[in-house]
Amino acid sequence: MVTIRLSRGGAKKRPFYQIVVADSRSPRDGRFIERVGFFNPLATGNAERLRLDLDRVNAWVEKGASLSDRVSALVKEAQKAA
């Protein structure tokens, strides 16, 4: 099953997440099919907190991909901002 989920990057105590389309059997930070955005929970000042390609997310959902709980909330946030 294909899932749209967060893949952690960044340094220790400074998380930065890529929003990726991946096979659910792949490791969290492992192989992925496509990168559709990023999420920076510690963004300060005028740094961008969330960037998401909603067209690609919707295309993957139409193909049967499921969203993780956190990504689902981020998609709603991005749709509200757009």
Curated annotation (Swiss-Prot):
Q: Which residues are the signal sequence here?
A: none
Question: What is a single cellular component term in the Gene Ontology annotation?
Answer: small ribosomal subunit
Q: Could you mention a single GO BP entry for this protein?
A: translation
What are the protein's GO molecular function terms? structural constituent of ribosome
InterPro entries of this UniProt entry? Ribosomal_bS16, Ribosomal_bS16_CS, Ribosomal_bS16_dom_sf
| Alphabetized UniProt keyword annotations | Ribonucleoprotein, Ribosomal protein
Family in the record: Belongs to the bacterial ribosomal protein bS16 family.
PANTHER family in the cross-refs: 30S RIBOSOMAL PROTEIN S16, SMALL RIBOSOMAL SUBUNIT PROTEIN BS16M
What name appears for this protein in its UniProt entry? Small ribosomal subunit protein bS16
The scientific name of the source species is Pasteurella multocida (strain Pm70)
Record lineage: Bacteria, Pseudomonadati, Pseudomonadota, Gammaproteobacteria, Pasteurellales
